[in-house]
């Protein structure tokens, strides 16, 4: 048993995962809720976390992050666009509105906040600025996990730690409306991204189990 206070277990933000989040948080176990793409699902994740921590015997000991996947949204949306001016906009706009939802839902919440975590923040399109998903998503109480190459780019860029989300929430709404006007169904896209993410997780889990079983057999 690792038994470290900063350890979190991962639970995917699927419909089936929501009650598990509540139950595990209520049991006093810290959780990284992962594979979040849609704002509607993020709202359900927050509700699941808050329901769990309200039942927890020692809520001060429990922490959680909600991992909102960023660059995959742009990868899916951009290939549907002919309008270059809207390429590279969907993911950041989506994340900024997620932060607005975080502020609303936790405004008067008395226990530890479930912090938004920006995941998948390495750019997939080489035409984009390498720090785009970092310097565009800075705000209090957020976390950003990034690959080493992106971290190196951030260090080299000497990015100022100023809020780049809340001043741009209205523009984020405008960008998503513009995408919807072009027929981009973001809900459909995020549903597909979630399903694909779960498939990848299951494949990784099966590979891990096979590797563990192989080592057990070797040790016999």
Residue ranges of each PLM-predicted region?
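Short secondary-structure boundary/hinge segments and terminal tails
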Residues: 19, 41-43, 197, 211
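Short catalytic-loop micro-motif centered on adjacent basic/acidic residues
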Residues: 7-11, 31-35, 188
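Flexible, acidic glycine-rich loops studded with aromatic residues
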Residues: 112-217
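Active-site beta->alpha loop and helix N-cap motifs at the rims of alpha/beta catalytic domains
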Residues: 1-20
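Catalytic cores of alpha/beta
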Residues: 18-25, 44, 130
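Catalytic alpha/beta core domains of metabolic enzymes, predominantly
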Residues: 30-149
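Glycine-enriched alpha-helix->loop->beta-strand junction motifs that scaffold or abut catalytic
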Residues: 3, 20-31, 61
């Amino acid at each position: 048993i690792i038994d470290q206070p900063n350890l979190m277990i991962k639970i995917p933000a699927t419909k089936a995962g929501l009650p598990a989040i509540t139950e595990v948080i209520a049991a006093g176990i810290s959780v990284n809720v992962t594979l979040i793409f849609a704002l509607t699902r993020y709202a359900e994740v927050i509700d699941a976390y808050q329901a769990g921590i309200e039942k927890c015997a020692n809520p001060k000991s429990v922490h959680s992050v909600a991992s909102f996947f960023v660059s995959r949204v742009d990868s899916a949306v951009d290939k549907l666009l002919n309008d270059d001016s809207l390429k590279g906009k969907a993911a950041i706009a989506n994340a900024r509105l997620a932060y607005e939802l975080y502020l609303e839902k936790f405004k008067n919440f008395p226990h530890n906040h479930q912090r938004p975590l920006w995941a998948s923040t390495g750019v997939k399109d080489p035409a984009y600025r390498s720090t785009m998903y970092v310097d565009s998503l800075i705000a209090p109480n957020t976390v950003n996990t990034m690959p080493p190459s992106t971290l190196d780019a951030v260090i080299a860029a000497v990015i100022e730690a100023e809020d780049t989300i809340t001043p741009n929430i209205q523009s984020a709404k405008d960008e998503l409306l513009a995408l919807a006007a072009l027929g981009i169904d973001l809900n459909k896209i995020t549903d597909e991204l979630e399903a694909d993410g779960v498939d990848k997780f299951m494949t990784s889990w099966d590979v891990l189990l096979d590797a563990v079983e192989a080592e057990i057999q070797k040790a016999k």
